């Protein structure tokens, strides 16, 4: 075997055994209920209700034991109270659409019926990746900046990558600019992506079940409750 051949073999083995390479994971977007016309109709109706601040509709589609948090808090009254649903600036009006727009995936957990959960990240998350330490880029060609500013140099471009997160919310360098950034770890150091282009799998997750009377929301909670 020639020296050149040996060198090539060593390089190939190093490439595939590199810890950095083994850490590269992607989470492509999915929407597993696209062929279910009843879901498409329901989701559009729910988004329309949220846009119009239609509290009656939102409360009407809640399961009576709807999950609100990971601490076991449940019920329609608690949902209304914890989400400040009677306020025009309820965070629900912002957070629920951001979850639904990303697509949904089915998941089955012990003691619960099969649920359709949005966004898809929690249901599709690799078990080998710590959901508390990583986030998933939810955009194609997201620019990673050297500093929390759109004017700073671009370090990399990411598309649906799972990346380690150092800080979930960093203010823009411009004091009065509302853009928030997330500090992520790269092979070569750290960089910043707009916070709307990355998401944690344990952020607010909305889960639904299909019943004889239609779709019901069973949870809107961190990690789906």
Segments the model singles out, each with a brief description of its role:
Residues 17-18:
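N-terminal signal peptide c-region/cleavage motif recognized by signal peptidases
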Residues 1-7:
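Bacterial N-terminal signal peptides that target proteins for export
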Residues 70-156, 170, 179:
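Surface-exposed, charged secondary-structure patches
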Residues 7-13:
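Hydrophobic helical h-region of N-terminal Sec-dependent signal peptides
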Residues 54-65:
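Short, well-ordered alpha-helical segments enriched in acidic and aromatic residues
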Residues 205-225:
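Long, low-complexity intrinsically disordered regions
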Residues 157-197:
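SH3/SH3-like beta-barrel superfamily modules
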